[in-house]
Curated annotation (Swiss-Prot):
Residues 204-223 have a biased composition (Polar residues). Residues 178-223 are annotated as: Disordered. Belongs to the UPF0441 family. Residues 178-195 have a biased composition (Low complexity). Pfam families: DUF1190 (PF06693). The lineage of its organism: Bacteria, Pseudomonadati, Pseudomonadota, Gammaproteobacteria, Enterobacterales. This is UPF0441 protein YgiB. NCBIfam families: PRK11653.1. It comes from Shigella boydii serotype 18 (strain CDC 3083-94 / BS512).
Length: 223
């Protein structure tokens, strides 16, 4: 009798586990699937200007122009700002800098400092922009300004980078690439001036972090 009771007890535990673990396993799988969807990447196109975009997307000239103009406004708000033209040129190269609008994200005290030293403050020209679908499945397009240095000594030389210094490869318009959805999110407004070489340091740090993350991912996939 004791033996029979033991067998039945074990059978009960087995059946209980089967009934109760299956829904849990399904729930865990669902969570991972949802997380995967939330972190899914975005396919974007890289253009130098609205004309490049229009040539690649016949019939969408208006959308291309709107995205380009929005990217220019975003560049004014988020691009690295320098107190002097010389500081900007040292980072991005001759002919790659412009005076920034006084209202372009800078705090009043920093505007005053820049105006005292050079009459204005400076920012790099927008070298191109990323264009992709709006987050949330909207019918319009999202855009992100890109910058590039012509100074061979800069870590940003010949590369497309966003306002945070993240590197998106060679500064070659017309490319399509896959980026995290966060890449298209609005960047913080620039509220202080950058010291000479400061943006290049940010690009170098971001590149190191990207390489480290890629290496970690590869090792994980390989076991």
């Amino acid at each position: 009798m004791k033996r029979t009771k033991s067998i039945r007890h074990a059978s009960f535990r087995k059946n209980w586990s089967a009934r109760h673990l299956t829904p849990v396993a399904l729930a865990v799988a669902t969570v991972f699937m949802l997380a995967s969807c939330e972190k899914s990447d975005e396919t974007v196109s890289l253009y130098q200007n609205a004309d490049d975009c229009s040539a690649a997307n016949p019939g969408k000239s208006a959308e291309c122009t709107t995205a380009y103009n929005n990217a220019l406004k975003e560049a004014e708000r988020t691009a690295p700002k320098y107190a002097t033209r010389e500081d900007c040129v040292a980072e991005f190269g001759e002919g790659q800098c412009q005076q920034a609008p006084a209202q372009a994200g800078m705090a009043p005290e920093n505007q005053a400092q820049a105006q005292q030293s050079s009459g204005s403050f400076w920012m790099p020209l927008m070298a191109g922009y990323m264009m992709g679908r709006l987050m949330g499945g909207g019918a319009g397009f999202a855009q992100q300004p890109l910058f590039s240095s012509k100074n061979p000594a800069s870590p940003a030389y010949g590369k497309y980078t966003d306002a945070t210094g993240k590197n998106y490869g060679a500064a070659q318009p017309g490319r399509t690439m896959t980026v995290p959805k966060t890449a298209m999110a609005p960047k913080p407004a620039t509220t202080t001036t950058v010291t000479r070489g400061g943006f290049g340091e940010s690009v170098a740090k971001q590149s190191t972090m990207q390489r480290s993350a890629t290496g970690t991912s590869s090792r994980s996939m390989g076991g």
